[in-house]
């Protein structure tokens, strides 16, 4: 699958690592072309034979991609949604953001909405927004596991076909996709993302922990 990742920070790196492991064609875009080129070179060095492309322009790269992952903080994601609105027409768009305040101890959204729903309202009606990866940490994505267990990736969205595409990407990267329901479930996912972040200092796990849904045998 042709996937564009916008944002080359730690989460962009982690998600790209998993998608490359799944054999997908990954293109990177960042406001800093040097940052995108550096990450592409590092990813190619880590996985011999891998070709990671670097996009010169975001809009053209969006049009050529099957899935667009917005691997940016909430404010940056809002800006991207505004700037690339037309290009994102009919695209599967993945929002990974947690709408954190400046001190990282609360959400800036009200309980009656979510970052994902806000972003969805900014996109064309044909765009299919999926919430995913906001409850996973970058280091665990690079490692591909937590405590020798595959990562659970919780997914929310209103379009089953779009969620299926994202689930295929997750599964191909050696992780477990869990469909939690409609996009409004992003409200709970973002609260869970916040809780995971605030627990890191208390537990001393250094952002290398993860949420795991333990299933009964035979499920």
Model-predicted segments: where are they?
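NAD(P)+-binding Rossmann beta1-loop-alpha1 motif at the extreme N-terminus of oxidoreductases
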Residues: 1-42
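General beta-strand structural signal in soluble alpha/beta enzymes
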Residues: 54, 128-132, 178-180
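Rossmann-fold NAD(P)-dependent oxidoreductase module
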Residues: 14, 18, 122, 169
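Rossmann-fold NAD(P)-binding glycine/threonine-rich loop
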Residues: 97-139, 143-145
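Rossmann-like NAD(P)-binding element
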Residues: 46-92, 96-103
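Active-site-lining helix/loop region of Rossmann-like oxidoreductase modules
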Residues: 151-219
